[in-house]
Amino acid sequence: MKILVTGGTGFVGSRIVHALRAEERDVRALVRRPEHGAHLAALGAELVAGDVTDPASVAAAATGCTHVVHLVAILTGKPQDFDRVMTQGTRNVIAAAKSAGVERFILMSALGTNATTKDLVPYFGAKFAMEQETVASGLEYTIFRPSFVFGRGGALATFMKQVRYSPVVTVIGSGLQQIQPIWIDDVAEHFVRALDTPAAANKTFEIGGPDIVTWNELYRTIAKVLGKRRALAHIPAGIARTGARATQWIPGAPLSADQVAMIEVGDNVVTNADAVHTFQLPLVPLEDQIRRAA
């Protein structure tokens, strides 16, 4: 088995490569700039320079691979950016996988992606298109839709920084929408298990952590774990969206306009237990996720 990973230098991708190499799986990572993949090479992954928007480089990277883990996505951009990187990029990876005779194609989507939200949030629209391309490809596939992914860094680090240093924590809208955060290494383990699980063939799985909380409860839980007492201040989603548009291009910005829109859409929780039954993996509770990231 030889696994091509796209997006392996990213937040989740790095942990997936780490999990694969921990089992001594043969990993080839497609990277735009090899110097950014030094940490993957140190794990024993093979680095191949290329870009999902360049069909020739993807085809070369896929040659000799039996499985593909496709993770590339962007959170911000213009409609043409989402189409070029996510939709067309997925078409390119699928074409390369088919030419290489890949046995299974594993896609990272997002919880909340469906036929309704695709017209409300550009990110969901691009993820929906990626799913559609995958299902129609003729390849054996597995699609994962994770809820908010928490780890060291990423969104959780932003939330924790706000709680740690600000006496008043701002919450978008009512804060009553529910989420189901999942620890990053639990996400990675789902991808690893999907390589060898016959029951995962041609399935789409929603995955989340063991705890469902509202945004208000999330911030209170973070404060509890950090030993802080914090007041919550709710701001209208429209104001948050305007602020996000103005700052989303700044490195380290807390949220993009699309991420604010995702919160507005409503609850982001798993609606069935298919992944639990299929993979039977232990999942890290929310408070432990926060402790690990602290």
For each of these PLM feature ranges, what is it?
Residues D119, S147-G153, G173-I184, G208-D211:
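Glycine-rich "substrate-gating" loop/helix at the edge of Rossmann-like oxidoreductase active sites
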Residues T6, L30, L71-V72, F105-L111, ...:
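SDR active-site strand-loop-helix element
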Residues T158-I184, K224, R229-D267:
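Alpha-helical membrane-targeting segments
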Residues G154-L156, S174-L195, N202-K203:
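Substrate-positioning beta->alpha
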Residues K2, R193-L255, V269-A294:
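Mid/C-terminal beta-alpha module of Rossmann-like enzyme folds, strongest
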Residues P34-N92, A96, L111-D119:
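NAD(P)H-binding glycine-rich loop region in Rossmannoid oxidoreductase-like domains
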Residues S109, E131-G153:
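Conserved beta-loop-beta element that borders a ligand/cofactor-binding pocket
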Residues I3-E23:
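N-terminal Rossmann NAD(P)H-binding glycine-rich loop of SDR-like oxidoreductase domains
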